[in-house]
Amino acid sequence: AFALMYSCSNAQVMNIANDNTDYSALWNDVDAALKKNLPQSASDILYEIDSLAMANGNTLQQIKVKIYQTAADKSFKPDYLKSSIESFELALNDAQFPYKNIYYSLMAELYDAYYQINSFAISNNVTLNDVSSDIDSWSRENFIDKIGTYYLKSLDNETQLKKIPLNECKDLLIADTQYFHLRPTLFDLLCDRAIKFFSSPVNAPLEISYL
């Protein structure tokens, strides 16, 4: 699962300096609802967090809401991944740096997850030159191309991404801080995620079209 989560202390870069709201109690309620297998209750709280974050201009909290909403939907929506993909795509369209980079990396992971779950059915699809908006019609090559393209787009504005220290974004991560020196910036983390995709032999495209 994608590890990037919510608040970041690097306000100059992440632009959330004016949001001093403590979301921790609400997130604890979300976690409790999910542990009790109450996805609808979790969704109600997520809606509350999203509304609050939107009012406060806290995009990272909204990203976290979408990540958790995917987890909540998984237990009762058969098409939860497709629904999440549509939701993330809408958010991606309006996002600005560096949130757009985060969304691209998230979207790449969602498309990859959808492909992995539906790979048998997808294996019978013919590669489309004019890719349809209906991902059920995509071929393996269409998915690999989309995923690879999004991982590359997540690395746009490399110089600026390298100015965001990962330690200053530690609340975004599910990770032990002692390992932050291995990936000192947001760019390093996003790059590592992309490398893991491209280095896997099963993701080798029949025709490379990313560059």
Labelled PLM ranges:
Residues 1-23:
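Bacterial Sec-dependent N-terminal signal peptides
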Residues 19-211:
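Extracytoplasmic/secretory-pathway proteins
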